[in-house]
A protein has these predicted regions:
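Short, Lys/Arg-enriched, disordered terminal segments
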Residues: 1-2, 26
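Helix C-cap/helix->beta junction micro-motif
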Residues: 28-29, 91
Length: 95
């Protein structure tokens, strides 16, 4: 079974994702698990340390005011959406 888990930012999302991955590996030892997260969150440390592959995306929130930073973040989000589709297409997950 091939599984993608998306978890980023804080341990509140990453640790449950790792727990789910561990349970899947226990039940289905031949399963392949891929994590997708950001390049600046806790996942860059926690996921590889748990023994799982991590692919990263650049995702940023938007500010309330109109700014050049918001424009750049929108472009990064569009690019990250394309990259996420690429990761999914290449990995071909069952779940």
């Amino acid at each position: 079974m091939r599984v993608i888990i998306s978890a980023a930012g804080t341990g509140g999302h990453i640790n449950p994702g790792i727990a789910i991955a561990n349970k899947i590996k226990k039940e289905e030892p031949n399963s392949e698990i891929l994590f997708i997260g950001t390049s600046r969150g806790l996942e860059t440390d926690l996921v590889p340390r748990a023994g799982y592959e991590l692919k990263t995306l650049e995702a940023y929130g938007l500010k309330k005011e109109i700014s050049f930073t918001n424009f750049k973040n929108i472009l990064k989000t569009i690019n990250s959406s394309r990259l996420a589709k690429k990761y999914i297409k290449e990995f071909k997950p069952d779940v």
